From Swiss-Prot:
Binding of CoA to the BbsB subunit induces conformational changes of BbsA and BbsB, which may directly affect the turnover process of BbsAB. Belongs to the thiolase-like superfamily. Thiolase family. Component of the BbsAB thiolase complex, which catalyzes the thiolytic cleavage of (S)-2-benzoylsuccinyl-CoA to succinyl-CoA and benzoyl-CoA, the final step of anaerobic toluene metabolism. GO terms for biological process: catabolic process. This is Benzoylsuccinyl-CoA thiolase subunit BbsB. CoA binds at residues 19, 121-122, 194, 205-206.
Length: 390
């Protein structure tokens, strides 16, 4: 989406991810309140539109969230967004779109989810419950397992290589107070954890979590009015829908991620080698390897070398998932994309303490896919490019 005027992040908020005993509306409220307080907002009616992403819980999630803040009523349009794992990021996209087009000067995007209190089966992640692939057991873990075995066949990668992704991301999460799983784990421990779908062992699969995140966005004029001291600019944002494939294709690629990232680079004027921080959709270890290549961080087939050479960790070309990624942070479906953005904002502001990426990161990118459409293709993909300063 071409931004018609400059848009900035005013404030962000998030809850700790994991298992919660309070419902999605309470979690969403906590994150939204944090984001608004961090934006120096002294009156709730300053927010002119609200978008709330949710994957599995309620048809009026947004109204439930803002009801408890006394913000429901005729002067605040609250729009609910459903797009599976991409829902939270898409809610932020919609808020950005409002500000970019001049519809509002200050908007909020929220993602919230509680799976502990609202259990769902893996079939719920399909674009259609009657989809023949899902009916025959082709759920997400199985699809990523097939991609992993093909990648191993083509590149010579081993299950131990895949396990290195979990080891890296768990190490990144060590000092992150919001992460669910943290602390050192070895390649052997990852490989020897329970097999789910070869070669995906349990520790190579993200944990489905509860949690929420929120992002307040506004115009440049509004940022100055609010006295935002550490501005973060939205350099670009792209939402894509996946193509339908009815023929054989390369399952080690990801058409929707390639298309979305190419458009984002063009829109923002920023190339993959200029990105300092990347939060990507590492729902499974193999996903991170494939996305290195799909987003142009390295050449096709060089993802494993990129990992082994330390290019995706501190001191490398681009720190991938410094918060710990979905593999360590947990994955509350509708909230994950918004949390990626919130964490990138904190990194660009230098607020991440023990897991801060260097003293002066300037560019941060986030990527999240949502649902399944056909074969290994995703139904949706949302990407944001953020830069430090005005």
């Amino acid at each position: 989406m071409k931004l018609q005027r400059e848009v900035y992040i005013a404030g962000v908020g998030e809850t700790k991810f994991g298992k919660h005993t309070v419902d999605f509306d309470v979690l969403g409220r906590e994150a939204a309140l944090q984001a608004m307080n961090g934006s120096n907002i002294d009156r709730p009616d300053m927010i002119q539109s609200a978008y709330v992403g949710n994957g599995m819980n309620d048809m009026t999630t947004g109204q439930a969230v803002f009801r408890g803040l006394g913000m429901c009523g005729p002067n605040l349009p609250i729009i609910n967004v459903q797009s599976a794992c991409s829902a939270g990021a898409m809610a932020v996209f919609c808020a950005i779109k409002d500000v970019a087009t001049g519809v509002t000067d200050l908007s909020i995007g929220v993602g919230t989810e509680n799976h502990t209190m609202h259990r769902q089966s893996g079939a719920a992640f399909s674009a259609a419950r009657s989809d023949i692939e899902t009916m025959h057991g082709a759920v997400m873990t199985g699809k990523y397992a097939m991609r992993a075995t093909r990648y191993m066949h083509e590149t010579g990668a081993t299950i131990e290589d895949l396990a290195m992704i979990t080891v890296k991301n768990r190490k990144h999460a060590t000092h992150n107070p919001y992460a669910w799983f943290k602390g050192a784990i070895t390649v052997e421990e990852v490989v020897n954890s329970r097999m789910v779908a070869y070669p995906m062992t349990l520790q190579q699969c993200c944990g489905i979590a509860d949690g929420a995140a929120a992002v307040v966005v506004g115009s440049k004029e509004m940022m100055k009015k609010l006295g935002i001291a550490k501005p973060v600019k939205v350099a670009g944002v792209v939402v894509e829908s996946g193509p339908y494939h009815n023929r054989p294709r390369d399952i080690t690629g990801d058409d929707i991620t390639e298309t979305t990232s190419e458009k984002l680079y063009e829109e923002s004027g920023i190339g993959p080698k200029e990105v300092n921080i990347l939060e990507l959709h590492d729902a499974f270890t193999i996903a991170e390897l494939l996305y290195y290549e799909c987003m142009g961080l390295c050449k096709k087939g060089d993802g494993l070398k990129f990992l082994r050479d330390g290019q995706s960790t501190y001191g490398g070309q681009c720190v991938v998932s410094p918060r710990g990624g979905l593999l360590s942070y947990g994955h509350p479906i509708g909230a994950s994309g918004a949390a990626q953005i919130a964490q990138n904002v904190k990194q660009l502001r230098g607020e991440c303490g023990g897991y801060q990426v260097g003293p002066t990161p300037k560019v941060a990118m986030s990527h999240v896919t949502g649902g399944g459409l056909s074969g290994t293709e995703h139904a949706a993909c949302t990407m944001h490019m953020l830069v430090k300063g005005w």
